[in-house]
Amino acid sequence: SHPEVFGESVGHAWYEYPAAMGDAKALHPWDGITQAKYTGPKTGTSTEWKELNEQGKYSWLKTPLWRGKVCEVGPLARYIIVYTKAKQNLLPDMTWAEQMMVDQIEAVSKVLNLAPEVWLPTMVGRTAARALDAQLAGEMARFFFDKLVANINSGDTQVANMEKWDPSSWPKKTRGVGLYEAPRGALSHWVNIENGRISNYQCIVPTTWNACPRDDKAGHGAYELAMMDTRVKVADKPLEIVKAVRSFDPCMACSTHFFNAKGEKLRVVTTDPYLGASVEA
């Protein structure tokens, strides 16, 4: 629970921490605060940005930090980690899934006639890793489905451990965390509970890791690094930038709530990949 191990800073995000603490300091998610402080763009209006204030606050995302470093998460990160550890003999007893990841990378390298370190850490490599990950997920789904069927056939129909589910058995103050390696990358939910009710809830989702604004000490997030030094052929049609960002498979808000300065809800815009967008007054 130490912020130097795992925390979020808001130095360049449109949020603020208590004045005595300062926005540059990282807070652990269990101590997280989500207090909006929208300062607007450097030039333009609050609704029509022309230039963001890169030296100040410029993003609605906080900056997650792992041991003081920004990180890229997702299929590319997983494949690079597993492949590197395998080649450095740090995985003496590889699982079948890890072996499959190594075999996938080497198969692509053979087709491209390029070493993994050449094609993998690129936009194309990031996109390819997502496709390879989908193939791996299919094999893993079949593996665990077979185990589920075997359990049911043996009479084991339990699907969850309910021993600690009853809130009346909890201490007056407690906390918990859910950690999961989602398809897009590292996902964590952090909750504080007092008297059986949630007192604070913080989420750090994969796109927050990748799309975060820079940290003055740790540097730029993955999106920003991917865009830097990228040549754009047509300035007002930056297709190269769009491709770079899309390679991360961004998870954008599917429901956006608009509030005025008094905290009154103005409207809700919900998007659906099949039905399009709907607006509620």
Language model segments and positions:
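Metal/cofactor-centered catalytic core regions of large enzymes
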Residues: 1-281
